[in-house]
Regions:
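Pyridoxal 5′-phosphate
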Residues: 8-385
């Protein structure tokens, strides 16, 4: 479990906790939930789910297979369970959370509902650029290339900018955005955060954002087609729920042939009934995160990342931008050795990693064992120039 101390900070009417000290340990019961291979270091791409997630998914699917009079209603209760767990972890009210099948759906919902201009980096993962370009409602103001810092955002702001969209963690370099500082710079504008590369393993002030959109298939280890969005009251007031369906209204079960008023809260962003099996998987994964504690998970991940970075440097590699504020992503190059060659060498050694855009990306989780570091070191050693 994890215990923490901190102080309550506020910015532009919003309060959030800034952690000042964390004392951590991970329960063995949490670690026993996972059985990925020792060399699996690709959680930034996909996180193999826990035993509890797989088992619940199977149980719910079996219930659906033998459906009776109350089965559908019983299965649909997983939605409220998942929304409540997500709300607890991001510091939102349960009425401010809506389930989604993926991050892109949530970002498209925001893009379709926003007027004015949105500031976003062209270096973002495409899930955080295409919605703004395709929706065509808000004009796009591109930030200068490089990490999305408070300074780069401040330089791009104008009266026309109504929102800033940023990833909590850069998918390519592992740069971790300073959400609290961005909140200060953005002011009364909406701060939209793609949290897929950090939620559940970073102890961030998520409530500093107006919109947090998270897919559950990576660090949350909930499997595909899982996710949620948390929207502040300000976001709900300013964004139009354009991407909203029959379940996003008052009395959705009353079929009277007339359009109904928009539902209160984040429920207005509902398009249709969620997959209850996916909702159950997400709820279980989120509750497992709660059982271990986000600070404990983050501390273990940073420790393993440090060990991997040392193995890379010992082999003559260069770690891309060793940020002081780190998440779980470690990108590197080996001088004179193409990234694809390094990736194949790692694969032969039993290491699962991503080789892309001239770099190799390693991304361990709290369940990653020390033996993984030895596998990486052994794979890189013969490649030294």
């Amino acid at each position: 479990m994890a215990t923490r101390t901190g102080v309550v900070c506020s910015a532009h009417g919003q309060s959030f906790v800034k952690v000042s000290q964390v004392v951590t340990s991970i329960p063995p019961s949490y670690l026993a939930q996972f059985r990925e291979p020792v060399g699996y270091l690709d959680f930034a791409r996909f996180g193999p789910p826990a035993h509890a997630v797989v088992e619940l998914t199977a149980r719910l699917a079996e219930r659906a297979m033998t459906a009776g009079p109350s089965t559908v209603d019983d299965l649909m209760r997983q939605e409220a369970r998942a929304e409540a767990a997500a709300a607890r972890l991001c510091g939102a009210g349960a009425g401010n959370v809506v389930l989604l099948p993926n991050t892109s759906t949530g970002l498209f919902g925001v893009a379709l509902g926003l007027a004015g201009e949105v500031a976003v980096s062209p270096a973002e993962f495409p899930a955080n650029t295409y919605p703004w370009v395709r929706a065509g409602r808000a004009r796009v103001r591109w930030l200068r290339p490089g990490p999305v810092t408070p300074e780069s955002v401040r330089d791009a702001l104008s009266d026309e900018v109504t929102a800033v969209s940023v990833s909590a963690v850069d998918f390519h370099t592992g740069y971790r955005a300073d959400l609290a500082a961005l909140r200060e710079v953005v002011g009364d504008r909406l701060l939209v955060v793609d949290g897929i590369q950090g939620f559940g393993v970073l102890d961030e002030p998520w409530s500093a954002a107006d919109v947090v959109v998270v897919g559950g298939q990576k660090w949350l280890r909930a499997g595909w087609s899982t996710g949620f969005a948390a929207l502040s009251d300000r976001a709900l007031d300013r964004l139009s729920p354009v991407l909203s369906g029959w379940t996003g209204v008052v009395d959705p079960g009353v079929f009277d042939g007339a359009p109904h008023p928009v539902a209160p809260g984040a429920a207005a962003w509902s398009v249709t009934n969620p997959n209850p099996i996916a909702a159950g998987a997400l709820a279980t994964a989120l509750e497992l995160v709660e059982s271990a504690g986000v600070p404990a998970l983050h501390e273990r991940i940073v420790e393993r990342s440090d060990e991997l970075a040392e193995a890379v440097r010992s082999a003559g590699g260069t770690v891309a931008a060793p940020w002081a504020r780190r998440a779980g992503i470690l990108s590197f190059t080996l001088p004179g050795v193409p990234a694809q060659v390094v990736g194949r060498a790692l694969a032969r050694a039993g290491v699962t990693a991503t080789a892309r855009s001239g770099r190799v990306r390693l991304s361990p989780h709290a369940s990653t064992k020390a033996e993984a570091v030895a596998l990486v070191a052994a794979a890189l050693r013969p490649l030294r120039g």
